[in-house]
Amino acid sequence: MPKIKTVRAAAKRFKKTASGGFKRKHAYLRHILTKKSTKRKRQLRPKGLVSQNDIASVVACLPYA
């Protein structure tokens, strides 16, 4: 049986947590930041968790995570 390839784009974006979830970076924090409030930018700063609905897709991309 051949090895399953990891989707490298996903490997760079998601990190597995100890409880089996996946950490991710919030969107909307790369450019066009002047019109966004300081509060909004601050709330986007910490890592988020992947939704339960999307976990299966991430696991399929990261077979060895």
UniProtKB/Swiss-Prot annotation:
Keyword field contains Transport: no
Gene3D superfamilies, A to Z: 4.10.410.60
GO annotation (BP), single: translation
Keyword Ribosomal protein attributed: yes
UniProt-recorded Gene Ontology molecular function terms: structural constituent of ribosome
UniProt keywords, alphabetically: Ribonucleoprotein, Ribosomal protein
Cross-referenced InterPro entries: Ribosomal_bL35, Ribosomal_bL35-like, Ribosomal_bL35_CS, Ribosomal_bL35_sf
This protein's GO CC annotations: cytosolic large ribosomal subunit
UniProt similarity note: Belongs to the bacterial ribosomal protein bL35 family.
Descriptive protein name: Large ribosomal subunit protein bL35
Organism: Hamiltonella defensa subsp. Acyrthosiphon pisum (strain 5AT)
Gene: rpmI
